[in-house]
């Protein structure tokens, strides 16, 4: 397969990652009374932050939405890199490397703090990026 194909596959997986993350909003997993109590405490305790009043829930929910925005951005950028790879894939190797390292670290963080689905998505994207890197050095990428 060609570099552009691996990058576009990574883009599609990233888009699915974005869809999964975004449809999971508000990212609360528990329905037990203790879980609900924690969520309500996150919503009710406000504190000043740089001149505005925020809660832990505001940060939790806001960061979740921010992650969705950046996931969509990554999907679009990976797709665009796939298009660029058709003309000069070798020049994309430094960019592919940066994305590869970021997704490997994302997988590690997923293992440490989250659950299997984001880990699998990050690993699949890392594999695609690794293969894109390897094929980008060849002439007919």
Enumerate the predicted regions with their spans.
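Core segments of alpha-helical transmembrane spans in multipass integral membrane proteins
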Residues: 28, 35-81, 101
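Hydrophobic alpha-helical transmembrane segments of integral membrane proteins
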Residues: 87-124
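Transmembrane helix-loop junctions in multipass membrane proteins, especially transporters and channels
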Residues: 26-33, 83-87, 111, 115-118, ...
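Alpha-helical transmembrane segments and their membrane-interface exit regions
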Residues: 124-136
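N-terminal signal-anchor transmembrane alpha helix
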Residues: 7-32
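Juxtamembrane helix-break-helix junctions at the cytosolic face
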Residues: 2-3, 75-92, 137
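Physicochemical signature of membrane-embedded alpha-helices that form the seven-helix bundle of GPCRs
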Residues: 9, 13-16, 63-66, 95-98, ...
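Juxtamembrane loop-transmembrane helix junctions in multi-pass integral membrane proteins
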Residues: 1-8, 51-58, 87-94, 112-113
């Amino acid at each position: 397969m060609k570099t552009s194909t691996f990058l576009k596959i990574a883009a599609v997986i990233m888009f699915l990652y974005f869809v999964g993350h975004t449809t999971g909003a508000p990212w609360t997993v528990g329905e037990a009374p203790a879980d609900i109590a924690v969520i309500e405490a996150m919503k009710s305790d406000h504190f000043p932050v740089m001149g505005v009043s925020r809660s832990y829930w505001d940060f939790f929910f806001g960061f979740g939405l921010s992650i969705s925005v950046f996931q969509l951005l990554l999907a679009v950028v990976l797709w665009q890199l796939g298009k660029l790879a058709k003309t000069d894939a070798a020049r994309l190797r430094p960019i592919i490397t940066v994305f590869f390292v970021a997704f490997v670290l994302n997988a590690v963080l997923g293992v440490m703090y989250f659950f299997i689905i984001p880990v699998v998505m990050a690993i699949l994207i890392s594999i695609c990026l690794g293969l894109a890197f390897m094929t980008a050095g060849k002439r007919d990428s």
